[in-house]
Amino acid sequence: MIENSKLSHYKIKKIIQCFCVDIPASKTALLLNLNRNTINYWYMLFRETIYDHQTDLRAKFVGSIEVDESYFGAKRQRGFHGKLKRGRGTLKQPVFGIFERNGRVYTEIVPDCKMKTLQEVIIGKVSLESVIYSDGWRGYNGLVDVGYSKHFRVNHGANEFARGQCHINGIESFWSFCKRRLAKFNGISKEYFDYHLKETEWHWMREPNELATELWNLIR
C-alpha cells in the first residue's frame, strides 16, 4: 500500500501516530503541514484496512463470554411523528456485541435483536464449550437448545447488575467507551458507521504505540 506513495515512510508513520490517538484529520494536516485531502485519504485507507483485519479474524471466542446489544444514532424514520423509545423499541441502529473476558471484543450491526438474529451471530462466533453471560432479554432464549449448556443471566429488570461472576460489566464498559469515542466525531454517516465501529473495536484496551506498530505492519 505504501510503495507507490509520494510520502516518506517517516511522514506516513507520523500520520499513523496521529490517527491512533484520534487526532482529527484537519488538525493532523496542520501539524504535519500536509494537504487535508491527503490526510483524509490516509485516514480512510487506515479505516478500510482495520475493517478488513477485524472482519477477517476467524478464531472463535472461548471461555467466559458476555453478550449484549446496544443502540446508536438518533435517526427518525420519515413520516414518524411519535416519541422515540429507548432501547429495544427504538428506531436507532442496533449493534450486537460479544465480549471475551480478558480478551477480544466483536461487534456486528444487526437488523434487529430477535432470537434468530442473535443466535446466528453467537453460533458463528462463540465456541459451544464457552460460558455465556447475558441479561434477561428474550432474544437470548434458546441458547441451551442450540448447544450452549452454560448460559447464565443477570436480571437488570429486577435491579440486579451482578451476581458473582454473573454480570455483563465488560461489554457494557465497551459500549460506554465506544459511544464516548464516536461522539468525538460529531456525527458519523451511515455509510461509514461500520468502519468507525470496527476501528473502536480495534482500539479497545490497547495502547497507541501498539496500535501504530500493528497498523504500520498491516499497510506495508
Predicted regions mapped to residue ranges:
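Residue-level recognition of single "structural anchor" positions
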Residues: 1-220
